[in-house]
Amino acid sequence: KNSIVEAVKKNSAKFIYMHPVDNFDLKSFYTQLIKYEVGSEEGICALLLNSFTLNCDEKIKKYIDDLDLGYISAESSAGEEEFEEAYENSINSKSKTLIIGNDLLEHERVENIVKLLSIIKKYSDLNLVILDKTLEQKINTCADLELEEIEELKSYNGTLVYKVVDEYNSDLVVSQTFANIAKVSNNNEVFIISKDEKIKRVVKIDENLHGTVAILKSKIDENIFNGYRYKQVKIQKVES
């Protein structure tokens, strides 16, 4: 985050932030926010492929031509016009960097995502910076570029948590909207219940957070909610 902020300040860089959760700390630095549905990263990569790749081979051109962009946009809640705007914002930039977070490694469609990103790296002028070393190796060594169709988006309804490692606390940080849906208040002790796990946390309402995705703070040595970092959960108040 600090490197991004520094680049924006020093070079007047245009910063386009793509994520299901808006980051209040970055709000004053980004040029454009593309907020998409949880789980739709494969579709987002396809939209990037369509917008940013140049001089592809015929097979990839056909793949792009056959993409149902309207459907992908609708399912991911990220409009084609947002990617057109992102491309327009990039045209006059001398250096263009696409930063790939470590959320993707445990995505159930990671293999096709890796192929999409490998092609974007090969056929666009985007410089890929991949924060996870394992994912970076997968993308850099990907030899099979036979793309699969974009899978229908799995529905993530109700209350969701996004796991973030934080060495200083282990709260459940929620928006007022999330608190209203879950029927909880600030400082309530709650159980967070997923398909396979049940953990206890203290609710902290953050007025700068919006939407129905809560931030689940987790200590680095805490072995909880592994896999894809977003989980569909139920929230249950701890009875005193």
Residue ranges and their predicted role:
Residues 101-102:
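Extended, domain-scale alpha-helical bundle/helix-rich regions
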Residues 55-56, 93, 97, 127:
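Short secondary-structure junctions and interdomain/linker hinges
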Residues 1-28, 106-240:
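A cross-kingdom feature strongest in bacterial/archaeal respiratory oxidoreductases
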Residues 39, 43, 81, 111-115:
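Conserved active-site and cofactor/substrate-binding residues in soluble primary-metabolism enzymes
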Residues 41, 105-106:
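Alpha-helix N-cap/loop-to-helix initiation residues
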Residues 1-78:
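Glycine-rich, acidic loop regions that bind phosphate or pyrophosphate groups
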Residues 82-97:
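Glycine-rich phosphate/diphosphate-binding loops that line cofactor/substrate pockets in enzymes
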Residues 31, 96, 171:
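Conserved acidic residues
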